């Protein structure tokens, strides 16, 4: 049994390394997946002003990663949770923290996500696209945890900031596979194709929830280890 952790838009940071250290202390083999560095990406800013993303690799290219062999428990944060949705069939269980869903296709809707759990804060303002995706699923995640008062990125250590996050007008309905495969973290491309607006976004740590839900995940893995 291996645990794989996928980072969010900030790259590998404290959310990922804290989770790694937690599970390694319990005796698990843990792998951090870095899907940015192979494409020359340090982080994604999701800004419309001075800090714009201008990368030419597509999300589909970024999310084609080499997972370790064997049974995998996946833990994804934000954009890493979206990577988890894309590669869901590879995992025996899939824990998705505040998923940063960009768009979805018919093939994504046809997957069975009942072996997934979603953990999101009630104050996270960026879940509209995931919620639209969830409502169309025939086999949605078995568990959805809604954490009272928690904001996006609550698993990160010592973060408390606000910024104007760009929101592109990508349709909330089913997207053609070819169009999906053309999506890339490039502000000029996405804005010209879909338009954009900005939304004040809060990123804020919650250490209590972090420990609580890492502990819950570890207990579930241990309890169902023979099943996995």
Regions found by a protein language model. Name each.
Residues 42-45, 108, 130, 155-160:
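Short aromatic-enriched loop/helix-cap "lid" or pocket-rim segments at secondary-structure transitions
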Residues 2-67:
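Serine-hydrolase catalytic machinery in alpha/beta-hydrolase-like enzymes
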Residues 93-152:
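The feature captures the conserved acid-bearing segment of alpha/beta-hydrolase catalytic domains
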Residues 47-52, 112, 161-164:
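Short, hinge-like loop/turn segments at secondary-structure boundaries
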Residues 57, 62-113:
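Primarily recognizes the serine-hydrolase "nucleophile elbow" in alpha/beta-hydrolase
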Residues 141-228:
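C-terminal catalytic histidine-bearing segment of alpha/beta-hydrolase fold enzymes
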Residues 5-10, 78, 99, 121-122:
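Glycine-rich His-Gly loop
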Residues 4, 31-34, 73-75, 95, ...:
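Hydrophobic/aromatic beta-strand patches that form the interior of the parallel beta-sheet core
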